[in-house]
Amino acid sequence: MKWTKIIKKIEEQIEAGIYPGASFAYFKDNQWTEVYLGQSDPEHGLDTETGLLYDLASVSKVVGVGTVFTFLWEKGKLDIDRPVTDFLPESDYPDITIRQLLTHATNLDPFIPNRDLLTASELKEAMFHLNRRNQPAFLYSDVHFLLLGFILERIFNQDLDVILQEQVWKPWKMKETQFGPVELAVPTVRGVDAGMVHDPKARLLGRHAGSAGLFSTVKDLQIFLEHYLADGFARDLSQNFSPLDDKERSLAWNLEGDWLDHTGYTGTFIMWNRQNQEAAIFLSNRTYEKDERAQWIVDRNQVMDLIRKEE
């Protein structure tokens, strides 16, 4: 059975030290099944259990900004082919559209010199004047969603945390989703204070960061994915929105057939299939002992492939 194979794979990866523990939930036949494996905090000997708050890293992109843009697009309130400069006139991007940002299809070079020495306002300013690569091509980058967050702040004339709270989390009763830092959370790195945002740009920009920095729980993400499986706003998302010929993307989501997914650096991913009415949530702190990103992508994809498999 699919469930058994997935759990066996996760247990093998914990045993191999890929991550110390994981919270996993799978939705099928209109119900969630959950499992909590390994340890959430090896230093203090704490087992993974229900109710834990995780640093979502880039999964924040869909739990926040991506959902608000999808609302605006679906209601006909926003033409996603409008240029960035309509909203951020001080930026150098009259030729880049919101669609390109949402699908990571620009020619922006995300490299910012001396990034770690900049203040929040200097970092924001630097993102308005990035260098360019030769031509637009798929390059997954946090700068796209940081710019999208700034655009939402202009559209709503509010701070991003207020926008996300009022547009998404409050109406959907997601009471445990919030910007970090938070007091109690699963530690992402041994010896670093739990609850601190792992992503450097998001840590600096705080509640204005559209790319990372959110913390959430299995319970809240279940609510979130159920809305994507059932609500009208998400019915047309399993199509390609990218202007590029060689990479299909939905609005904010990665697209693999009927499956949409988003992953996060700290060892997180969520995925859903509206056609099959299936969804999955995987939360871990794979950066706790080591940061072997290339190997993690291989291991993560093994779990995701098992979830996508037809029974």
Outline where the language-model segments fall:
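Short beta-strand scaffold segments in enzyme catalytic cores
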Residues: A22-Y26, N254, I270
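Short, surface-exposed loop or secondary-structure junction motifs
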Residues: E34, P94-T263
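Short, glycine/proline-biased beta-turn/loop segments that scaffold the active-site neighborhood
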Residues: D79-P94, P171
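Short, gly/Ser/Thr-rich active-site loops of penicillin-recognizing serine hydrolases
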Residues: D246, K290-E311
